[in-house]
Each structure stands twice: as structure tokens, then as C-alpha cells.
């Protein structure tokens, strides 16, 4: 009997379109002999719409953008959830595991993961806490520091502090970090809202842009060097892929460079020494464990001109688009795309089975 996979995508997020591209790629790559795919679309307004079981190739992402005339779902309806933990009423439509392909807020940040936990449904990827920490760059970097992982200097600022502090906030950035520096929303991915600043006027513009996407931002010193990324999969015994290098044709790796074909060169495997690769692997595994990750992650690094390795961030649900680094890293590590998806589903079921052994009641 085939495993029924509910592919969850879209979402109320600035990265809605990225999610659609990722979902299309995964749906077309998943092995139809082993899995039945049930699309579940979350509109930009937050409505959940369940499509019919996939029977062919998804040619264009617009095929995945269901309208309100399709079957609407109520995300939480406990009377629809049998003891087995399935997501729908009839056995014919039972979903065995959810593959959340949601990027950014309201999807990659632990919110949907919490819902799936409440429904007792297996799901691919990281849990509630790990997803939330992986989305919040400030909390993430605080944990990196606690774990002793080398990283660029950074400062965090809330919108309230910015409005109240005025020019003093910019003074602090210049004193602690200097120029150039990068300004990012704390809770956004895919380089949404990121700016490179070379002077105070840039900083003012960058703050206004980043605060469109979050109430908290992070400012980081610029590390001159190369951008190296590595894939990690697993639960209690995570393993790493080969390393890859990002060579953006623009000044830095922004949204367009990530998702527009021809904007970025990916070098796989990266031209690093064996010692550097071992350091990158070791730091990636340490970060994976420090943040209590499970399933998968892409860990990003800077390799400075002097050979020093700095951890940048983790991505708890890396993209699976045709131009995405994560699946390409695993393909070059001997794990084809469809097999990678199959492994991630197996890891999700393994973790869920382990959770079923936990006792949630207490009697004296």
C-alpha cells in the first residue's frame, strides 16, 4: 500500500511564491510507485484548500493555486481526527505524513509544526522549537554563541528601540560593527528585506526596509570571503553532504540571485581544503544539535580570506527549486532527488514513532 503524503505549501508569508516553486519540484520528483500525493494549498489570505490526489506532472505553479471553489479545509477540527492520527474523515483520504514546504513566517517558524503536533500527525522536517529558533536569527545566533561556534559580530534592534533611540541606534551600529554591514529582518528567509550598508544613509534606508517584514532586525558585520553551504539530514545521527559554494553575480546573495536562473553560480563540491571541510562538517553537526534540529537543514558559512570558518545561519526548510543548493548538494553526495525525499519522509515517520513512546499522563 502506498504512503499518502500531504504536501503543504503556499502560506501567508512573503515567501509564498518560493513555496509554490518548491512544492512543484517536490511533487514532480516524488516516486509515484511508493507515494500518493495530496496537495494542500494555503492561500496568501490563510485559507486552507485541499486538492485532489495528484495523478500527473505539475507543469506550472498556477496549477497549484486552487481557488475557493475547491474543497476548503478547517485546519483544526478534532472530530475529524481518528485515533490513528489521520487528517481527514474517510479512510480513502487518510494522510499518513505531511510534507510542509512552507517558507518564512506562518510556516517555517514553528506555527504549522505546532498544529501538526496537536493533530498527532507525522511531518517532515524540524519540530516546533527548532523551527522557531531557526527562523529567528537573533535567538539562533545567541545559541550559536552559547555553543561556542565562531560567527560574525551582530547587533539586534527592535522597532520600538529604533523609534525611541533615533540617531543613537545608528551610532551604536557604527561603533560596534562599522561598515560595511548587513541589515536583515530577524524572522524572514530567502534574503527577503536584506540590505548591504556602506554609510549611515544606507543604514536608515535598510532599517525602514527590514522593519516592513518584522518588528525585530539583526545587523551583522561583513565578512570578506566566500559563501559555503552544506546539507545535513538525520535525527539523532545526522550526516553531512559535500560542501558547495555560492558565487552570486550580484554584490551579495539576495532574493533575485537565489530564485532567478543565471543570477548565481553554484560550485559543487566547493574548492576547500580537507581541513576546512572537516571544520565545516563539525560546526554544522554542532549547530544541528545545539538547535535540536531533526530531519533536515542547510547550514551556511563564510570562509574568510585567511581561511577562518564562520557559521552564518541554518535553514530548517531549505528550498527544493531547480536552482536550490540543498538537493544539489545531496545529488553530488550520491543521493538522487527522489531518494532524498523518500529519506526525509522515512525520518519523519521514525521521529513520530519515537514520540508515540512518550508517556503524557502521570499517576502516583
From Swiss-Prot:
Positions contributing to Mg(2+) 2 binding: 313, 315
GO-annotated cellular components: cytosol
Keywords: ATP-binding, Cell shape, Cell wall biogenesis/degradation, Cytoplasm, Ligase, Magnesium, Manganese, Metal-binding, Nucleotide-binding, Peptidoglycan synthesis
Binding positions (Mg(2+) 1): 300, 313
UniProt-annotated binding residues for ATP: 174-229
Entry note: cofactor: Binds 2 magnesium or manganese ions per subunit.
Function: Cell wall formation.
Protein name: D-alanine--D-alanine ligase
